[in-house]
């Protein structure tokens, strides 16, 4: 888990405590987070949308509040990744009824960090080209290098480590919206097309 590798000083700016975040039992972890964090000034969340929905709904049950702004009035930012956010957008808007809430989508996986929303007025993400990953894409049976992708086409993503020791089709599909710079929309398999 990445959280166990963070520097000691990050604990000054985050909640819950490291011990709580690392509880292996999911239900005990959720309860611990509710006990600790409902008394904190929380301004941001980060993580996988599905997991955060479970947590946020439990926080509302725990506190008896109707939305998260009643618990954390300064909540303004959610950085999310791991899955496409579109299916979760309405649920989050209901839990956090704020026009000022900022959602930052990232495309990360166990294999690496691939893209992020660098322009919050757009739905697509900027592909990270200098993070130690070699990209290829599969369209049917054809393998396409990054420089060969076409806007509007849906591809299965293949990543290779920079040292070439492993190559892996990660199971997600992307649609390129631009090739200068490379921007894409993320779909969880199968693609919507």
Segments and roles (model prediction):
Residues 2-189, 193:
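Active-site glycine/GP-rich loop and adjacent strand/helix microenvironment
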């Amino acid at each position: 888990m990445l959280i166990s590798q963070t520097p000691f000083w990050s604990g000054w700016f985050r909640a819950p405590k490291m011990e709580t975040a690392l509880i292996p039992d999911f239900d005990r972890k959720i309860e611990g987070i509710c006990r600790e964090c409902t008394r904190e000034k929380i301004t941001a969340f980060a993580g996988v949308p599905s997991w955060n929905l479970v947590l946020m709904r439990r926080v509302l049950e725990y506190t008896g509040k109707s939305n998260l702004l009643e618990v954390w009035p300064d909540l303004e930012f959610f950085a999310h990744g791991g899955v496409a956010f579109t299916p979760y957008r309405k649920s989050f808007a209901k839990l956090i009824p704020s026009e000022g809430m900022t959602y930052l989508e990232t495309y990360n996986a166990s294999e690496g960090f691939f893209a992020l929303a660098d322009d919050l007025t757009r739905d697509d993400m900027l592909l990270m080209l200098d993070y130690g990953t070699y990209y290829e894409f599969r369209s049917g049976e054809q393998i396409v290098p990054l420089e060969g992708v076409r806007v509007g086409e849906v591809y299965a993503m293949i990543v290779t480590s920079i040292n070439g020791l492993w190559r892996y089709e990660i199971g997600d599909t992307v649609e390129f919206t631009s090739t200068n710079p490379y921007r894409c929309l993320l779909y969880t398999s199968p693609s919507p097309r």
